[in-house]
Swiss-Prot record:
Record key words, sorted: Hydrolase
Reaction catalysed by this enzyme: carbamate + 2 H(+) = NH4(+) + CO2
Homology family: Belongs to the AB hydrolase superfamily. Hydrolase RutD family.
Protein's UniProt name: Putative carbamate hydrolase RutD
KW Hydrolase (keyword) present: yes
InterPro entries in alphabetical order: AB_hydrolase_1, AB_hydrolase_fold, AB_hydrolase_sf, Pyrimidine_utilisation_RutD
NCBIfam families for this protein: RutD (TIGR03611)
Any one GO molecular function term: hydrolase activity, acting on carbon-nitrogen (but not peptide) bonds, in linear amides
Length: 275
C-alpha cells in the first residue's frame, strides 16, 4: 500500500485499484484506531476494490493531541477531508463498533459520497451493558495504567476458546499494543465521543443501503444492538454470525469475509441500479 501524498490531511493507506474505476472501500476500525485491525480482510478486498485504511487521528501514524470535546462528527469530517484530498469522492464504508458510528455520521453528513455502509457490531446509542463494560475498563486504566487496559482488552474482543488456543499470539499482540498505546488522554476522549454518540433520532435519514453484521456471542456489544439498528435504518439487511465475539472479523475471517464480499457486491449493485 502507498501513503496518500496529502500533507494537510491524515495519512491514508490506499491499495492500487484492481481495474479502472474500481469501487473504493474505506475501512474504519474501532476504539483502538489502528488500520492494521483489518489485516484479515485486505487480501480478499483488494482483489475487487481499491481499499483505504488508516490509523485514526491521535493513534498510530496520525499522532495528535485530541481536544476534550472531540466528537464522532469530527472523526467523520477529518476522514472525508483526507479522502477528498486523495482524490476520492465516492466510497463505501466498512466500520467496526466506533468505526460504524463514524460510518453513520459520514452517511448523514456526506450522503452524495457514501455509496454503501457496512456496520460491524455497531449500535444506535450505547447500550447499558456496553457502558458498564467500558466503566470497568476505565477503572482498570485509571488504577493500572496502559498495561492493565491492554491486558484486559482481549477478554472483551475474543471468545474464550479462541483465546485459550492462542496464548503466544495474544502475548505478542499485547506487547505491540502497549508499545503503540495511543495515550490515556486520547483514549478517554475517543471513548467519550463514542459514549456521547446517539443516532436514534437521525438513523432514518441514512438513505444508502446498509449491511449489518453482528456476532451473537459478542461480550461487549449485545447483538440486540444490531437488531435495533436494523429496525431504525430504512434500507438495511442484517447478518448474524453465531461465533466470533466482538472482533469476529479477526476470529472467523472466512465466515466474515464471505458475508462482507457478498454484501458489498449486492448493495453496490443495488445502489447503481437505483441511480
Amino acid at each position: 500500500m502507498r501513503i496518500s501524498p496529502s500533507e494537510t490531511a491524515m495519512k491514508l493507506s490506499l491499495s492500487p485499484p484492481p481495474y479502472a474505476d474500481a469501487p473504493v472501500v474505506v475501512l474504519i476500525s474501532g476504539l483502538g484506531g489502528s488500520g492494521s485491525y483489518w489485516l484479515p480482510q485486505l487480501a480478499v478486498l483488494d482483489q475487487e476494490y481499491q481499499v483505504v485504511c488508516y490509523d485514526q487521528r491521535g493513534t498510530g501514524n496520525n499522532p495528535d493531541t485530541l481536544a476534550e470535546d472531540y466528537s464522532i462528527a469530527q472523526m467523520a469530517a477529518e476522514l472525508h477531508q483526507a479522502l477528498v484530498a486523495a482524490g476520492i469522492e465516492r466510497y463505501a464504508v466498512v466500520g467496526h463498533a466506533l468505526g460504524a458510528l463514524v460510518g453513520m455520521q459520514l452517511a448523514l453528513d456526506y450522503p452524495a459520497s457514501v455509496t454503501v455502509l457496512v456496520s460491524v457490531n455497531g449500535w444506535l446509542r450505547i447500550n447499558a451493558h456496553t457502558r458498564r463494560c467500558f466503566q470497568v475498563r476505565e477503572q482498570l486504566l485509571h488504577s493500572g495504567g496502559a498495561q492493565a487496559w491492554v491486558e484486559a482488552q482481549p477478554l472483551f474482543l475474543y471468545p474464550a476458546d479462541w483465546m485459550a488456543a492462542r496464548a503466544p499470539r495474544l502475548e505478542a499482540e499485547g506487547a505491540l499494543a502497549l508499545a503503540h498505546f495511543q495515550g490515556k488522554n486520547n483514549l478517554l476522549r475517543r471513548l467519550n465521543a463514542l459514549k456521547r454518540a446517539d443516532f436514534s433520532r437521525h438513523a432514518d435519514r441514512i438513505r444508502c443501503p446498509v449491511q449489518i453484521i453482528c456476532a451473537s456471542d459478542d461480550l461487549l456489544v449485545p447483538s440486540a444492538c444490531s437488531s435495533e439498528l436494523h429496525a431504525a435504518l430504512p434500507d438495511s439487511q442484517k447478518m448474524v454470525m453465531r461465533y466470533g465475539g466482538h472482533a469476529c472479523n479477526v476470529t472467523d475471517p472466512e465466515t466474515f469475509n464471505a458475508l462482507l464480499l457478498n454484501g458489498l457486491a449486492s448493495l453496490l449493485h443495488h445502489r447503481e441500479a437505483a441511480l
